[in-house]
Swiss-Prot record:
Gene3D superfamilies: Ribosome maturation factor RimP, C-terminal domain, RimP-like superfamily, N-terminal. Required for maturation of 30S ribosomal subunits. It holds the Pfam family DUF150_C. InterPro entries: Ribosome_maturation_RimP (IPR003728), RimP_C (IPR028998), RimP_C_sf (IPR036847), RimP_N (IPR028989), RimP_N_sf (IPR035956). This is Ribosome maturation factor RimP. One of its GO terms (biological process) is ribosomal small subunit assembly. It is found in: Cytoplasm.
Length: 142
């Protein structure tokens, strides 16, 4: 079985994109989220989709439908380097184990330090062990 994220990361990097996340959904759907500095356009998604369709055919990767999209305004933070890249932005963390009787924390991301997510919540600096973060997303300012 091929490690698809490991196979796609260098391919997408060569095209100028970052693999944010990959998920397999029902009915053979393969959903791929990409990003690049300055954001992703529909033309970027089409170009990546066309490239990957050919790659998957050559490498005999099983899927029925391919969906390529941007991660959206509420982009998930999935890699440790995401926490440094988006320092200063507003984020929402969903915790595995509650802290201060809260399972969700929202505040300004300060970064990642020694496997701990640093953020300011309600004017107070907090440190959350990265292993306790179930999900993290940018919180778009509207």
């Amino acid at each position: 079985m091929i490690d698809l994220p490991a196979r796609l990361e260098p391919v997408l990097a060569g095209l100028g994109y970052e693999l944010v996340m990959l998920e397999r959904a029902g009915r053979g759907l393969l959903r791929i989220f990409i990003d690049k500095p300055g954001g992703v356009t529909i033309d970027d998604c089409v170009a990546v989709s066309n490239h990957l369709t050919h790659l998957f055919t050559v490498e005999n990767i099983d899927y029925d439908r391919l969906e390529v999209s941007s991660p959206g305004l509420d982009r998930p933070l999935v890699k440790p380097q995401d926490y440094a890249r988006f320092a200063g932005e507003q984020v929402t963390l969903k915790l595995r184990v509650p802290m201060d009787n809260r399972r969700r924390l929202s505040g300004q991301l300060l970064g990642l330090e020694s496997d701990a997510v640093k953020l300011v919540v309600d004017g107070r600096e907090m440190s959350v062990d990265l292993r306790n973060v179930d999900a993290a997303r940018l919180k778009p300012m509207v």
